[in-house]
Amino acid sequence: MYLFRNKFVALLLVITPKSFWPMKKLSSLFSLFLLIPLFAVASEVGDRTIPAEVAQLADSLKQKFAPDKRVALFDVDYSFSGKNVMLRGVTTSAEAKTALLDGLAKKGYAVMDCLQVLPDEAGLEGKTYGIVNVSVCNLRVAPDFSSEMMTQGLMGMPVRVLQRDGWYRIQTPDNYIAWVHRVGIHPVTREELTAWNNAEKIVVTSHYGFVYSQPSQASQTVSDVAAGNHLKWEGTKGAFYKVAYPDGRQGYISKSISMPEKKWRATLKQDAASIIATAHSMMGIPYLWAGTSSKGVDCS
């Protein structure tokens, strides 16, 4: 049986006057009240040892729905008090959660369900997408600057936002799930992402450069840029393109280090000679674990 999604629901049931509830529901509510202390025990001092039958169920579901933790999550924390169990943690698969709840119920467990399915729509206030907002952002295993780096994101790259906890937990276009510092992306709604994707872009073609506040390299810089960065094309002025960032900032980038995306795509060559020439152009760029940008490149 599935009882409460969180403690607050249980607390609400306890403090609500009985006069509010129809008499025919009082007996069932009384039964629920009797179970609340059991879940409280499971929450605070519950046994974290997972019974073999539950471990087997969890392992089978993880293999089915999240075999590669880099691209799918099934991180469940269990707290037991006899046949009562509280579930905490996160998963990216609603199917996996349903299968877990069904499996536990069939084995006779009463479940307090606090397992969260990502993306966290409510916590993100509808902004379940994002756009990389800096030249290169580092994506990490955990929400900490000392955590191992998984990969990198380039300015203009769309991502799926799964969770916010100081940092953002995101999923990249190639399905990697990682944490990024909040300044690295600009959260948007689905509609805002569609507008960004449909806008004409300017692509940075040089390994490194800058966007300026005015169409002059003597003006204040807005930010740096790196090869492969995408900016919204707002117009042209002399030797510069006027561009906009995902967060709305504007500036000017030299035509000598960038070009319209459509033109860039038309000139791409994917033959062996062109790929080797591009690789040679990056000789001397520093090695960086999980680096995928012109600021630092991994060996792979």
Task: Show where each model-derived region lies.
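Beta-strand-rich, non-transmembrane domain signature
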Residues: 77-82, 101-105, 112, 116-129, ...
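Boundary regions of SH3-family modules and the immediately adjacent low-complexity/disordered segments
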Residues: 102-122, 172-203, 216, 221, ...
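A short, polar/charged loop/turn motif at coil->beta-strand junctions and beta-hairpin connectors
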Residues: 126, 130-133, 197-200, 205
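Bacterial Sec-dependent N-terminal signal peptides
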Residues: 1-45
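N-terminal capping segments
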Residues: 47, 51, 55, 63-72, ...
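Beta-loop motif signature
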Residues: 132-158, 204-233, 287
